[in-house]
């Protein structure tokens, strides 16, 4: 039995290493092939042809048929008398001003304590006090005694402060039936061996687009803003595959 325990441990470790190797095998091969080279920028592609792209579907009002009046320059349903150069059609470009500042402080403290004690016994059962036989030995005055104490003390706090200020150009990928625009923009900046990526997507109203063809990120509905990177610095900040596998499998 003493020899089988180390063998079981070896098998378990080997299985974990194999799992981690399979999980990151393809990624590791690509990283080995790119040693000493700068991370490559992704090619410019049509966002609607990317894997996983899904058109946005939102509740829409009933369509209204535009009518024209004789000798009138105004069309019913028009939102402006003169045409401007702001983004309005699929393929048009507008600038998104990302101005994000978030700060949160949360503190929780919980204390709980409980003490319970119970005694149970038989002092007299069918004249057991008058009977002097060995049977009286099984009828003690105290049969069961329980005593329990439990306590819980928990503290938690969250302190978070984030800020992001930048501009990114976005492309109109879809025009909804009510006139709202679905936009998506991606920006990549490479500095030495690190690439910083900024992705902005969401739904905007044409009325919220300013005269200089810009819009603030706070006016984007269903906004999806992602800011991250990839490269040598990001690799150092990420835990190794083996550690990630152990964190998932180990229950303690």
Curated annotation (Swiss-Prot):
It comes from the Bacteria. A lipid is attached at residue 26 (S-diacylglycerol cysteine). GO terms for biological process: bacterial-type flagellum-dependent cell motility. A lipid is attached at residue 26 (N-palmitoyl cysteine). It is found in: Cell outer membrane; Bacterial flagellum basal body. InterPro entries: Flag_Lring. GO terms for cellular component: bacterial-type flagellum basal body, distal rod, L ring; cell outer membrane. It is a lipid-anchor. One of its GO terms (molecular function) is cytoskeletal motor activity. Keywords: Bacterial flagellum, Cell outer membrane, Lipoprotein, Membrane, Palmitate, Signal. The keyword Kinase does not apply. Residues 1-25 form the signal peptide. Assembles around the rod to form the L-ring and probably protects the motor/basal body from shearing forces during rotation. The basal body constitutes a major portion of the flagellar organelle and consists of four rings (L,P,S, and M) mounted on a central rod. Belongs to the FlgH family. This is Flagellar L-ring protein. It comes from Rhodopseudomonas palustris (strain TIE-1).
